[in-house]
């Protein structure tokens, strides 16, 4: 199919070669010879600290900087793999491995990557856990199923594939929260070994986890024995700036807000795993958990600044530039005739959908919500709860960028309704939102005397920006419907988001900030 354009994620150097190279089984020497140890410059530690004391605008809320968090030391100890900052370190070096991992052969691709980034690992002692699409009952009838406990299924959202690589004894662990890793329908069967491993599907979407405490009460640490390999979905480069994603990964790591990035390859990342359990529509409402999410988001919004940014420069919000870009890419005619028919019968023409978004954006921009560095995709599967540490961490930074504060929160509230089984009756009620937002503001503004007026103002902004979230993911879903190879009904999901936008539009745009109302 012509030539493949290859862009190094760190230098922007471009080269071309014929075709898409497949993973070669005996490519270790080639890979090691061509690993490109490029560098991505990050701010020095003193520059980072200076950036913490600046705020990108002076909008609805006072500048949150200035007062130090009295629990800062405690919080740092709870951050992902938080370590003392090396004052002499100026650059983060991340290897680039020139491998393209085929979606149909992700295990072999993961093995080739491990040969480079974990050369001391004996691959015969490594077990893998990957995402598979078919349901377990469809492929392995219970009455004569023969399964092995080598490969397990879990998901990485609905656009990428994720492979967990577990070295030695890590594979023997059970999930304390969910019991055996064998699905309920196959429990009690004797595991068997086979030259061709059988892949079974886990019934939930939790990360591989083990929160158990050691004898001294500290959490069990297995990160060094686990590597996660993410393979990007088909044509997702149309939606996501992969160089920016890598920069975001490293940036957030310097703040203790992201795990270590071990390497990149042509169509993915290799990184440290985060122990814990992904949230679901029930746990996200638990009083032990939701305040952790609110504070973690506020911490990101308050602290993170890109190197070189200053209060004099107001960044372009992600929601504007990404939505416009996606609208440009949605095809006038879908290549799949059935999808095209469904889209045509369900949605406004793209030109009118753009007009609808532009009018909404003009209204939302006037709300003067602060522009902060945001995650922008806090669906429940991107929030990891570690019970033994009583912490949450966010994963997946594909859409992280500067954006309106209220969008990040409103988007998270909308995601509380689920993805695979969306139920918009789960959208958080007013009283819950007010509690959540008060906790958020305490962390964001670094003070406890939050006024009711401040909470009310943010409540209005958040719900009105939730409308923008619905349009954004509607357009995103239409684009995915054309290009993604993941087995997911993107047209159906777009329909759900767009209908919820229409259902809530008048209600949310009618909101006004009530004063002195708890």
Curated annotation (Swiss-Prot):
One of its GO terms (biological process) is mushroom body development. The modification Phosphoserine is found at residues 190, 194. Residues 1-88 are annotated as: Disordered. It catalyses: ethanolamine + ATP = phosphoethanolamine + ADP + H(+). Its main location: cytoplasm. GO terms for cellular component: cytoplasm. GO terms for molecular function: ATP binding; choline kinase activity; ethanolamine kinase activity. Keywords: ATP-binding, Cytoplasm, Kinase, Lipid biosynthesis, Lipid metabolism, Nucleotide-binding, Phospholipid biosynthesis, Phospholipid metabolism, Phosphoprotein, Transferase. Highly specific for ethanolamine phosphorylation. May be a rate-controlling step in phosphatidylethanolamine biosynthesis. This is Ethanolamine kinase. It comes from Drosophila melanogaster.
